[in-house]
Amino acid sequence: MTLTALNAISPIDGRYVNKTRALSPYFSEFALTYYRLMVEIKWFESLAANDTIPEVPALDNKARKFLSDLISNFNESEAEKIKEFEKQTNHDVKAVEYYLKDKFQENEQLKSCVAFIHFACTSEDINNLAYALMIKQAIAQVIQPTIAEIMGSITLLGKQHADVAMLSRTHGQPATPTTMGKELVNFVARLKRPQQQLAEVLIPAKFNGAVGNYNAHVAAYPEVDWRKHCANFVTSLGLSFNAYTTQIEPHDGIAEVSQIMVRINNILLDYTQDIWSYISLGYFKQKTIAEEVGSSTMPHKVNPIDFENAEGNLGLSNALFIHFANKLTQSRMQRDLSDSTVLRNLGVAFSYSLIAYHSVAKGNDKLQINKSALQKDLSENWEVLAEAIQTVMRRYNEPNAYEQLKELTRGQMIDAENLKKFIKTLSIPEEAKAELMKLTPETYTGLATQLVKAFS
């Protein structure tokens, strides 16, 4: 059976393949094979560039081009050849080594140097660099731009509705008014910090042999400064070097990335749940598409499916990222292999996040403010002005200010007339009374509008 979106087991490669395809160059089996091949070639080139290793001569132009072409021209057909070697070896990294040994026979200079492919390496030297590069590129090329798009769309909504007054709800009950714009930009302000941390996080990598001590390196070439050579090699690939490891790089960097992703996703979970609630309250309507159906039985339905989809996928993503952060930082003694199968699922976690991000962006595009619903809620909850009145009373030392307003408003249905009658009885300056008399739930929004306009 040919794998298609219809018969794929995972919805990542099935139903949602159009949303996740952008991650395929970084997290597919082909991608892992490609990055392993690249690391093996770059390591060989570093040996050739070290004049204290005479057995690997400096590469001539033909050899350099040959190696460069192996990387740039690598395709699925070549990857299948590596998979054929793996059928013999039952070892994926060794299969890459054998593939390169076979390829080196095609170049006059390189065929005499096949012994230096995978020289002094353990598989984890190759793998940890490959995974680090995959994560780094996926974040830079796919995840960060998509997060930035969401932040931009929420900011735009916030700016558009900067002065649209809204009844707040704390504990689900009416509270001090705000503006819709202010509540939206709050989420962007929260996202800025983890987004910046995700951009700056360094994923460490090791290249120090079977148990982290350069044992084989030193046995073969004791005169080479392997610590310096390997550190330079790792940093030349744009990664930070971890000099103190066991056989594996301890994955603390991947754990850090995972925890940052969880924080980003939790903020977006909070956002999707709030938007869902605002839609439920009628504060937002959703643009309809004529051909779409909201319910198989209720023709009138326009459901907030994009935000619900995002909520579900963010939860799936977080479950995996939390597992990565907890699991990958633990390995028995100098290593066990239980991290290997977990690492192969890195792309799954990022994919669920990406599906969710696309759903949030799609949902945002459908939102239309319903000012009449917002105004109706405000006009029915004049009791929220009790805070303003008792605070002004305190300024002028009116006795028992809080208690007076509590007695007047707590659990009561209050309208404008009730409040104005109460204000007239106060022993505060007439100017202060006049200001309170002008106050309405719709105008009692503090600096909310200014905060949105100042936000960037």
From Swiss-Prot:
The keyword Metal-binding does not apply. InterPro entries: Fumarase/histidase_N (IPR024083), Fumarate_lyase_CS (IPR020557), Fumarate_lyase_fam (IPR000362), Fumarate_lyase_N (IPR022761), L-Aspartase-like (IPR008948), Pur_lyase (IPR004769), PurB_bact (IPR047136), PurB_C (IPR013539). Pfam families: ASL_C, Lyase_1. It is an enzyme of class 4 (lyase). One of its GO terms (molecular function) is (S)-2-(5-amino-1-(5-phospho-D-ribosyl)imidazole-4-carboxamido) succinate lyase (fumarate-forming) activity. Its EC number is 4.3.2.2. One of its GO terms (biological process) is 'de novo' IMP biosynthetic process. Keywords: Lyase, Purine biosynthesis. Pathway: Purine metabolism; AMP biosynthesis via de novo pathway; AMP from IMP: step 2/2; Purine metabolism; IMP biosynthesis via de novo pathway; 5-amino-1-(5-phospho-D-ribosyl)imidazole-4-carboxamide from 5-amino-1-(5-phospho-D-ribosyl)imidazole-4-carboxylate: step 2/2. PANTHER family: ADENYLOSUCCINATE LYASE. NCBIfam families: PRK09285.1, purB. This is Adenylosuccinate lyase.
